[in-house]
């Protein structure tokens, strides 16, 4: 399954209607996001039963604020609607 672009109007529905959801918070200008993005896409294809979403922090500032995103890329995971994991993604160096 390819990644989904997640926006505020579909966020709650996505979290509530899927058992496992992994979200990548990113931005166009972010160098580490550009490196992490293709890896995230490949992983999403390897796990078709998991919903992988991408949230552009520039376009979805309310969602980024809701989770206190201060560093990108940041990955968060929900299981059965509950926040399970949050972590800034690995960076080179």
Language-model features, listed with the residues they occupy:
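Conserved Rossmann-like nucleotide-binding pocket used by diverse enzymes
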Residues: 2, 26, 51-53
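Conserved helix-turn-beta segment immediately C-terminal to the redox Cys motif
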Residues: 20, 37-55
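Conserved redox-active cysteine motifs that mediate thiol-disulfide chemistry
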Residues: 25-38
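A short, hydrophobic beta-strand/beta-hairpin element that forms part of a small beta-sheet core
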Residues: 73-84
């Amino acid at each position: 399954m390819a990644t989904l672009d997640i926006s505020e109007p579909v966020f709650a529905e996505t979290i509530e209607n899927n058992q496992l959801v992994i979200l990548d918070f990113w931005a166009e200008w972010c160098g580490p996001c550009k490196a992490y993005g293709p890896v995230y896409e490949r992983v999403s294809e390897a796990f078709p039963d998991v919903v992988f979403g991408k949230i552009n922090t520039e376009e979805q500032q309310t969602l980024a604020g809701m989770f206190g995103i201060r560093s990108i890329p940041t990955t968060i995971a929900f299981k059965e609607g509950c926040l399970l994991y949050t972590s800034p993604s690995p960076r080179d160096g």
